[in-house]
């Protein structure tokens, strides 16, 4: 089984997309870090959400914050919740109201003006993320969006948006998790002085 070309092209494509992040998205990544840190300094909670692979990324980033990002960095837990993690709430909402309301209903219940909603969507067109953004804004929350391609319907709807310059879902998700890790580093450094 020979897959040298496939493997090489996947790695090169991933490198190419990530190389574009630094010059074009550095200010937005820094701005997102500031929004998250400011919320946490004000006793806010970070609410993450996504669908499919982005759901896994949302849960991953929230877990890094609640537990710890870097091994050996002992620190207080950071309040971060992945809204896509409670199966009872998700299935009840999908059954009773519809899948598009999964995150909106939870933000309606819990979101406060000191909190931040962080939505991950590779297309920028996920209806449940769109409704969550609208609910977050109603609650006076800040919104950070990790998007892909042209940003979709969510382009221009956030306080800070980070749009990955690719239309390939895998490349967008790889970049989203990289940015999530960078944001974890910024938070640990700003709140606890950890490198």
Curated annotation (Swiss-Prot):
**What is the reaction catalyzed?**
2 D-sedoheptulose 7-phosphate = D-glycero-alpha-D-manno-heptose 7-phosphate + D-glycero-beta-D-manno-heptose 7-phosphate
Instruction: Name the principal localization, coarsely classed.
Output: cytoplasm
Q: Name one GO cellular component term.
A: cytoplasm
Could you tell me one molecular function GO term of this UniProt entry? Answer: D-sedoheptulose 7-phosphate isomerase activity
Give the pathway annotation.
Carbohydrate biosynthesis; D-glycero-D-manno-heptose 7-phosphate biosynthesis; D-glycero-alpha-D-manno-heptose 7-phosphate and D-glycero-beta-D-manno-heptose 7-phosphate from sedoheptulose 7-phosphate: step 1/1
This protein's superkingdom?
Bacteria
What EC identifiers does the entry list?
Answer: 5.3.1.28
What is this protein called in UniProt? Phosphoheptose isomerase
Q: Which organism is it from?
A: Leptospira biflexa serovar Patoc (strain Patoc 1 / ATCC 23582 / Paris)
Q: What is the lineage of its organism?
A: Bacteria, Pseudomonadati, Spirochaetota, Spirochaetia, Leptospirales
